[in-house]
Amino acid sequence: MRASSKKKVLVFDSGVGGLSVFQEIHQLLPHLDYFYLFDNEAYPYGELDQNVLISRVNQLVSALVAEHHIDIVVIACNTASTIVLPSLRDNLSVPVVGVVPAIKPASLLATQGVGLIATPATVTRQYTHELIRDFAQGKPVELLGSTRLVDMAEEKLRGESVPLDELKSILSPLCNKVDVAVLGCTHFPLIKNEIQQVLGSNVVLIDSGEAIARRVKALLSCGELEEKEEGIKRIFASAPPWQEDALNICLAKLGFNPVQIYRHLGVSDR
């Protein structure tokens, strides 16, 4: 009975990058029940038709919210956040929190320049350029879009080492140009240590994870909770994930059960 009274959080992404957001929320609020759902069948979202994306996310999230009586939804994906949040908020009766690149706090810290490391879809999206226009404080912003960094994060969670020489080559356009870098994809905090190693200790790395965690706490009105036991952690995928056994080893270290398959899509949305 006590377990059923816990607040339930759903973290959603197209891949496992949203686990970086889960970790921040869990660090602040360890006594909640956590559900993680990733739509790997349609990964990566940046290449998906917008209408298909809206339909998929709404169906998957709405089904899991209803089935598990979720109290708050976190869309831990920049692409989905910019495209799907309005319809999700219309369809759901629970709060929905999205992610945006942390341009404003980065610009307040920067003296030399800001680097935005994100996916190609994010760096070319109009919404991102509006964020830069409105919040960059006149600081120069260097844009770097990479899908390979996303793959590196996925591989790291499956026990593979991050190839530092390749990472250095990818990040080279930012070297000696910025003193603050925004990790503008939820995958990238998973390889934060490696990115820091390449860019150097003089570059400050910023992501949205802590801000999202504080927002979740505020929306759930979570004060000092009396509950001392940690909640459950369950993870679902829309299709069998690659290198599933290796992934499950990492997930177990985070307290999750092995990945379960979650199918709640119509034929037209596959």
From Swiss-Prot:
Signal peptide limits: none
Residues binding substrate: D13, S14, Y45, G46, N78, T79, T186, H187
Keywords: Cell shape, Cell wall biogenesis/degradation, Isomerase, Peptidoglycan synthesis
Gene Ontology terms describing biological process: cell wall organization; peptidoglycan biosynthetic process; regulation of cell shape
Record bears the keyword Cell wall biogenesis/degradation: yes
GO molecular function: glutamate racemase activity
Class in the EC hierarchy, top level: isomerase
Enzyme Commission numbers on file: 5.1.1.3
Known catalytic reactions: L-glutamate = D-glutamate
Pfam families reported for this sequence: Asp_Glu_race (PF01177)
Keyword Transmembrane appears in the UniProt entry: no
InterPro entries in alphabetical order: Asp/Glu/hydantoin_racemase (IPR015942), Asp/Glu_race (IPR001920), Asp/Glu_racemase_AS_1 (IPR018187), Glu_race (IPR004391)
Active site residues per record: C77, C185
Pathway listed: Cell wall biogenesis; peptidoglycan biosynthesis
Biological role stated in the UniProt entry: Provides the (R)-glutamate required for cell wall biosynthesis.
Family: Belongs to the aspartate/glutamate racemases family.
Protein name (database record): Glutamate racemase
Gene of this entry: murI
